[in-house]
Amino acid sequence: MASCFCNKVDVTEGTHGTSSSDDALVSSQDPRHPANLICTLCKMFYYNNWVTGTGGGISIKHSKTGHIYIAPSGVQKEQLKPADMFVMDPASGSYLRTPQLYKPSACTPLFMSCYKQRDAGAVIHTHSQHAVMCSLIFDKELRIANIEQIKAIPSGKKDAKTGKDINLSFFDTLVIPIIDNTAHEEDLTEGLQEALQKYPNTTAVIVRRHGIYVWGPSVDKAKVYNEAIDYLMEVAWKMHQLGIPPDCGIGEEKKYL
């Protein structure tokens, strides 16, 4: 059984304001700064119907400082501002910045699991309807093959000569584990960690009747993976509606139609 990291993360509600030094952590004119980029991406995800009704979340690791930036809980994601961000020191699990009005994201222990077990640069959590539908259709795994968009997803392997990541090929099968939902978000941590151990090459975990967690070595990669996987989940759902197994071989679909 996986050891749980959640006891190392302070997820208590903030009760104080922020000093000017705290505000410096989220004040930048650079649109690529994590505090700014989280706002941009959350608005984009909102209009994709991935984070409606305050659901979902996102976290980005600062590439220079290593600080973890996390969107707060219970906030309409399309209205987020940089000043709304929590900032965490990953080494201690304590907050360097706590906005006065908001609670830490309940996703925080799961985000930290991805940072620690996958060395992620960013983690995205959406309430994608395609993820929910796939979790109702499939049991322990989503398996899909022979679809062009699979080539956007990493295989978990590296090129022996260059050391660069190798993506899946058109003919490969993408496998995404599915874990059962819990009454409280933070209680998903152990199930997520077990999936990370059992599926060392996966870059996503679907949560049944809930949504999906997707991560990558950078925020750009995580965004690409999330978009590609959502597309593939929609294709898998529609293939199932036609009676076609999403991982069927090329040409085999004809016998199901």
UniProtKB/Swiss-Prot annotation:
Primary localization: cytoplasm
Protein name (record): Methylthioribulose-1-phosphate dehydratase
Keyword Metal-binding belongs to the record: yes
This protein's encoding gene: MDE1
GO molecular function: methylthioribulose 1-phosphate dehydratase activity; zinc ion binding
Co-factor binding details: Binds 1 zinc ion per subunit.
Catalytic activity: 5-(methylsulfanyl)-D-ribulose 1-phosphate = 5-methylsulfanyl-2,3-dioxopentyl phosphate + H2O
InterPro entries registered for this protein in UniProt: Aldolase_II/adducin_N (IPR001303), Aldolase_II/adducin_N_sf (IPR036409), MethylthioRu-1-P_deHdtase_MtnB (IPR017714), Salvage_MtnB_euk (IPR027514)
GO CC entries: cytoplasm
Taxonomy, superkingdom: Eukaryota
Cofactor (UniProt): Zn(2+)
Biological or metabolic pathway of the protein: Amino-acid biosynthesis; L-methionine biosynthesis via salvage pathway; L-methionine from S-methyl-5-thio-alpha-D-ribose 1-phosphate: step 2/6
Coiled coil location: none
Lineage: Eukaryota, Fungi, Dikarya, Ascomycota, Saccharomycotina
Annotated GO biological process: L-methionine salvage from methylthioadenosine
Entry annotation: catalytic residues: 148 (proton donor/acceptor)
Family: Belongs to the aldolase class II family. MtnB subfamily.
Function: Catalyzes the dehydration of methylthioribulose-1-phosphate (MTRu-1-P) into 2,3-diketo-5-methylthiopentyl-1-phosphate (DK-MTP-1-P).
Protein keywords: Amino-acid biosynthesis, Cytoplasm, Lyase, Metal-binding, Methionine biosynthesis, Zinc
UniProt subcellular location: Cytoplasm
